[in-house]
């Protein structure tokens, strides 16, 4: 009889382990992976899909199974081990009153140890590491158990919902829990630290989060740096100009940059030139879209995709041209700098010279500088480090140094209030 009871104890521990493994596995498994297995014809995947589609109900089934086996183990385990150990401790000569206490304590420790280690911790570890295999293996038995205990599960869930409502709360299902952006960033950081994703993946996803908060003004090519073609130029003059500038698309202006009429693609100009066609620039000019400089980058990209236009002109609040944005500028916000064969000699946007020591393009965003140097430059009206430096001192030239925010800002290249490059060193730590 004692042997049968010991066997029953280990069976209960085994059943507990199955429910614990099932609980962690169905939470851990990815729905996309299950869908792939369904497409490959795995019948077990259909059962697993049914479970993760009704996750709350099946988690309740797991919890009910764990509770039932735990109660059975508590009812059978300690008395059985106590009867098994009592004769052994009697042989040691321990007086009977103390013998009973010692036997009870040791039996309780043994049952607790077996339950926690074999019934909880070990299956949890296995199911987290092998969530897919465990989910497929346990899916059909768990569905059978759910069907058998369905009335109890419904009664327990209903009672729990009624109880929490009495205290003014609402029951929330697992699939209704929303993860915030900050929580996603923390999960991403932990995955990167554990080596589950590489540095490029970590950087791309972070940039996607930041992308949603960007406005076009922050990534534009400013008005002063726009290479344009005048409508009055001949085809030959325009071609000579694009050979020097080496861009693909150019805004076409009339009189000045506040009057942009359209865009010309260099391919169209070369085609017309080599065919010997006597045409004017307005005949090969394409339409251009104009948007306010504060438009979110995401909205601008959608519009450019919809209208199949690669360049947009940004307009300031007074109606003048503020700058332009290309599709490449937008994509670079996610994937980083894109360089072609004509960009070989360009200085990187941000060049690290040492610890807390950088050389930056004047168009570098203040947010980027703050993140790199762990400082807090604040100016809601200014986007770039060059703009902020001009608020500190309007007449800046190459070689000038400004000390602010615990950093040294040295102007490396500037002309007519246009700061091209600045060297920044953090001096206060």
From Swiss-Prot:
Disulphide bond pairs: none
SMART domains named in the record: CorC_HlyC
Membrane topology field: Multi-pass membrane protein
Keyword terms, alphabetized: CBS domain, Cell membrane, Membrane, Repeat, Transmembrane, Transmembrane helix
Record flagged with keyword Membrane: yes
Domain CNNM transmembrane span(s) in chain numbering: 1-201
Coiled-coil regions listed in the entry: none
Family statement: Belongs to the UPF0053 family.
Protein name: UPF0053 protein YugS
Gene from which the chain derives: yugS
């Amino acid at each position: 009889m004692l042997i049968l009871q010991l066997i029953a104890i280990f069976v209960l521990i085994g059943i507990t382990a199955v429910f614990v493994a099932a609980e962690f596995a169905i939470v851990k498994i990815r729905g996309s992976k299950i869908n792939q297995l369904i497409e490959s014809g795995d019948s077990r995947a259909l059962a697993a899909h049914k479970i993760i589609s009704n996750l709350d109900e099946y988690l309740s089934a797991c919890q009910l199974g764990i509770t039932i086996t735990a109660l059975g183990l508590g009812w059978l385990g300690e008395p059985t081990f106590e009867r098994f150990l009592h004769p052994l401790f009697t042989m040691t000569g321990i007086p009977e009153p103390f013998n009973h206490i010692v036997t009870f304590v040791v039996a309780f420790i043994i049952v607790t140890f077996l339950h926690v280690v074999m019934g909880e911790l070990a299956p949890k570890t296995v199911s987290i590491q092998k969530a897919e295999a465990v989910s497929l293996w346990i899916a059909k038995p768990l569905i059978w158990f759910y069907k058998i205990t369905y009335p109890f599960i419904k009664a327990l869930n209903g009672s729990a919902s009624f109880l929490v409502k009495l205290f003014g709360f609402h029951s929330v299902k697992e699939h209704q829990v929303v993860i915030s952006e900050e929580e996603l960033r923390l999960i991403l950081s932990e995955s990167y630290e554990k080596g589950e994703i590489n540095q490029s993946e970590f950087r791309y996803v972070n940039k996607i989060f930041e992308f949603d908060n960007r406005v076009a003004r922050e990534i534009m090519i400013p008005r002063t740096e726009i290479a344009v073609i005048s409508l009055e130029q001949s085809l030959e003059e325009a071609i000579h100009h694009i050979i020097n500038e080496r861009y693909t698309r150019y805004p076409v202006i009339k009189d000045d940059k506040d009057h942009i009429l359209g865009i010309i693609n260099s391919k169209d100009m070369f085609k017309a030139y080599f065919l010997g066609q006597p045409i004017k620039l307005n005949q090969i000019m394409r339409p251009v879209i104009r948007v306010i400089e504060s438009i979110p980058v995401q909205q601008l990209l959608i519009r450019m995709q919809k209208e199949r236009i690669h360049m947009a002109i940004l307009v300031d609040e007074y109606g003048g041209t503020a700058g332009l944005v290309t599709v490449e500028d937008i994509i670079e916000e996610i994937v980083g700098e894109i360089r072609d064969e004509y960009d070989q000699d360009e200085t990187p946007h941000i060049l690290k010279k040492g610890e807390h020591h950088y050389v930056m393009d004047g168009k570098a965003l203040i947010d980027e500088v703050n993140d790199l140097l762990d400082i807090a430059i604040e100016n809601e009206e200014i986007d770039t480090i060059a703009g902020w430096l001009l608020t500190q001192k309007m007449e800046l030239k190459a070689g000038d140094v400004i000390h602010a925010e615990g950093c040294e800002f040295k102007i490396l290249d500037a002309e007519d209030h246009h700061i091209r490059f600045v060297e920044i060193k953090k001096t206060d730590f």
